[in-house]
Amino acid sequence: MRQRNGYVIREERLAAEEYIDFLKHTDLGSQYPEERFEERIGTLVNKASISLVARNETHEIIGVCFGITDFAYWLFITDLGVAREYTGKGIGKALVGRLLELAGGKENIIMYTCVNENAIPFYEKIGMKKSNDVMVYNHIDWIDFVVE
């Protein structure tokens, strides 16, 4: 558990319903396909290698970060979200930093993620760079929707 300015970051598994409710307060809620949404979110929250949650003084969820890792070489950030009213306060950076630390540290781990255009400045600010060496196998047609 990490105490920060008015919030705590800890390893915590959320229930699917908690995460879905949190998504309504973020800009992350438009990244998921509509197909089997609740079922797939349940799998995500239960199976991510590392699950971090930031909570404020009243225990509300204000940030979430999930990662998949082998704890030896690589880490993939699947989800990073901060409640809209808490953006710009360093919570996302703190979550990613803790995620990297738990995965094995910056000396050992290469970190990847897939982001929308609006998130690129954030990831560049924390030291990530666009890469041309990642391959993708994507044969799924998703129906876009927004969690509301």
Residue ranges and their predicted role:
Residues A103-N116:
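Conserved GNAT acetyl-CoA-binding A-motif
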